Amino acid sequence: MSALRPSTGTITRGTPTSADLLLQLRERQPLVQCITNAVVTGFTANVLLALGAAPAMTDVPTESGPFARIASGVLINLGTPHAEQREAAVEAAHAARDAGTPWVLDPVAVGALPVRTRLAHELVALSPTIVRGNASEIIALATGGAGGRGVDATDEVEAALDAASLLARTYGTVVAVSGAVDHITDGHRLVRVHTGDAWLTKVTGGGCALGAVMTAFASTDPDPLRAAVAATSGYTIAADIAAEGARGPGSFAVGLLDALDAVTPELVAQSERLS
């Protein structure tokens, strides 16, 4: 992609590192409002708690907007968008935008299903701080394509970079494309994160929880690209640690929570691999 210039390990000289942002997160214990899908609610909350953030599953209309104004960050995940939650998501997105609260959009299965596709396009027009999805979701959101196979990607990450750049520049957002190597761009800078384990794809909520982690990190830094990179690095380094002792997806899921609790800024500094 000629429009994007890959960054080196240090995104901007003299600015906080991923390790610094993890330390800030644990000191601040950000309050993360999660409007997320019913399948992953418990796992997402546990991931945030293990990391050092405070989850709040506030997804009821008339409550979601006021809460978004006081939360440290808001996650909107479209995995199971029933009617009441759709209303709450739009309400929270407007409130977050008006209050300056960072918020993350995870457009699960956009393009594949009509209700969430319409909702995703309505929400992305409100300029989320970060959009996180797999390659097929990002392509569908940017181009109006058909998307992947439900929640699963059918496109490679590299194939989504033009779409990610277009989304980022059009809506003034950072776009994180998840895959074997995560790609994160603001339409001008591009960072690749080379840590992570395939076990993440075998645990329900493995990707959705990353959106919540990005929300927590977005509250620690005014540069959402840097926050998204730090979130991805911290989460995937913990996944690598968990995979070392895993016997299967069940032990990996439990091990991931333990690793998120145990991962230190020093370990992130030593283990982070960016290009």
From Swiss-Prot:
Q: Which cofactor does it need?
A: Mg(2+)
Top EC class per UniProt? transferase
Q: Superkingdom of this entry's organism?
A: Bacteria
Query: What keywords tag this UniProt record?
Result: ATP-binding, Kinase, Magnesium, Metal-binding, Nucleotide-binding, Thiamine biosynthesis, Transferase
EC number(s) on record?
A: 2.7.1.50
| Source species taxonomy | Bacteria, Bacillati, Actinomycetota, Actinomycetes, Micrococcales
Q: In which pathway does it act?
A: Cofactor biosynthesis; thiamine diphosphate biosynthesis; 4-methyl-5-(2-phosphoethyl)-thiazole from 5-(2-hydroxyethyl)-4-methylthiazole: step 1/1
Q: Which Gene3D superfamilies does the record match to this protein?
A: 3.40.1190.20
Q: Which family does it belong to?
A: Belongs to the Thz kinase family.
One BP annotation, GO:
thiamine diphosphate biosynthetic process
Q: Which InterPro entries does this one have?
A: Hyethyz_kinase, Ribokinase-like
User: What the protein does?
Assistant: Catalyzes the phosphorylation of the hydroxyl group of 4-methyl-5-beta-hydroxyethylthiazole (THZ).
Pfam families this protein is in?
HK
Query: Which catalytic reaction applies to this protein?
Result: 5-(2-hydroxyethyl)-4-methylthiazole + ATP = 4-methyl-5-(2-phosphooxyethyl)-thiazole + ADP + H(+)
Mind telling me what this protein is named? Answer: Hydroxyethylthiazole kinase
Q: Where does substrate bind?
A: 57, 205
Instruction: Answer yes or no on keyword Mitochondrion.
Output: no
GO molecular function, a single term:
hydroxyethylthiazole kinase activity
Q: Which residues does the record give as ATP binding sites?
A: 132, 178
Question: Does the record bear Magnesium in its keywords?
Answer: yes
